[in-house]
Structures are given as C-alpha cells and as structure tokens.
Amino acid sequence: MEKDAEFAKDWPTLVRAIESGIESHDGREAQLLAYMLSHNPTHPLDVLSTIDEFSLREDFLISVGPNKADILRDLIMREKPRMLVELGGYLGYSAVLFADAMVKAHGGDEGLKIYSLELDPICAAIARQIAQIAGLAHIIEVVEGTAASSITNLVKENKITSVDFLFLDHVEDLYEQDFKVVEALSVLKKGAVVVADNVIRPGAPEYREFIRGDMKKEQGWESRGVKGLIWPGNFEDELEVSKLVGLEVNN
C-alpha cells in the first residue's frame, strides 16, 4: 500500500490514465497545445521539456518521453540521416526531437527532411503547430492518413526516393505489415536504420520475430533490442534497432 501511494505521488497522471483506461484522444491533445502556447517555449529542447512537463503534471501523453529521447538522439547523431520517416507522429514530440538532432548532426539544415505520418487529423494539426513553435516546420512535414497509403503516395510523387531512418511508433500490430510496405517500395538502401518503439510494452512480438528472422538476416539486416523507459512511470521497455548492413532490399 505504501508503494502504491508513493507511485501515485510520483506519477499522478499515469495513475489517472490507468484508472480510467484512457490515455489519448480525449481532448488532452488540445489541452497540450493551449499549455504550450501559454508557456511560449522558444527552442526545440524547451518544446520537448514543455510536453514532458504537461505529461507529468497535467495529463499523461503517449509521447516517447525523455529517457527514450536520449537514446533516439544518440542514434541520430551516430547515423546522421537526411531523410527520416516516422509512422505515427502523434503530437510531434519525436519529429521535433529528430529534426533538432539532425540539424546538430549535420551542422545545419540543408537537405534535411522528416515526413511524420499521422492518421488522426486533430493530432496532425497540433503536430504542425508544435513543429512551427519549435522553429522546425521547414524540415518537418506532417502527412495525414494511414501510414501505408501516405508513404506509398510520397514515393509515387517522388518526394521520397530513399529512407535513411524509419521510426515505427503507431500501432504495434501494424509494424510488420507497414515495414513490408516500405520495403516493397525499394526505399530502404544499405545503411538504412529502422527503429520500432514499444516492442515490450505494449509489445510487438510478431514484428520482433520477423525482423530478427533468418530471412531478414540473409537480406543483410542486423537487429537488437535497446532498453528504454516508458515515461511517466519508468516502466522498462525496449526499442528494436535494425540496420541494413548487407544487401539492398529488392535490388
């Protein structure tokens, strides 16, 4: 009982989300935008901190949070992608994180692009405003629609010819299906990195089995789990980090 009280004190918004069974798409997203505008952050890192503060003190958000943000930032700094696509943009937290890290990794913003694919029109609209507040709207383009149809259209329109970094953070049951859609478009070249969030919580066992399977190994994919924390709450989770180190897919 003492532990429960301590947990509730440390993570009040998470406790409310658990008790209600609702963690998104109930108006809290619009409340975040109002909170953001009232705090008026002027730097990408301030934007991320403001979202984290809202999630901790006002209402729980399903953003990646500060612990995983550090892991993803390090990956961007190491891999230095120029074209990044995320499936499941939500409110733009990860897009702002990625864009800021990409600018730092390259020492400028020339030739950098992020396509953030988001199904929900309200979340997409808020994400666009948050990208604008962060000063990164020239890099981040939020595309509304299903992940599969959106990336297919972007490739058909020649807006995407290759993807350096693919972030899967939408519906875990769609990770494998939508990875295969991207793979079939022949935009994952040697050196491409694919990161899947929440492979432990709530879990993506089918995707993990698929990406670590013999077929993907034969195609040149290497994959590993990287421990991270779901925040608020500090629940243990993992990011599945995969890289195409050998043969190019479908070439």
How would you name each of these model-derived features?
Residues 1-47, 58:
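N-terminal auxiliary segments of SAM/dcSAM-dependent transferases
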Residues 2-11, 89, 140-202:
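Active-site segment flanking the S-adenosylmethionine/decSAM binding pocket
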Residues 22, 97, 126-129, 152-155, ...:
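Short, well-ordered secondary-structure micro-motifs
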Residues 41-64, 70:
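S-adenosyl-L-methionine
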Residues 42, 46, 93, 121-122, ...:
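Short alpha-helical
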Residues 60-149:
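SAM cofactor-binding core of SAM-dependent methyltransferases
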Residues 101-111, 155-160, 184-191, 213-220:
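Alpha-helix termini
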Residues 174-251:
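C-terminal substrate-binding/active-site "lid" region of AdoMet-derived donor-dependent transferases
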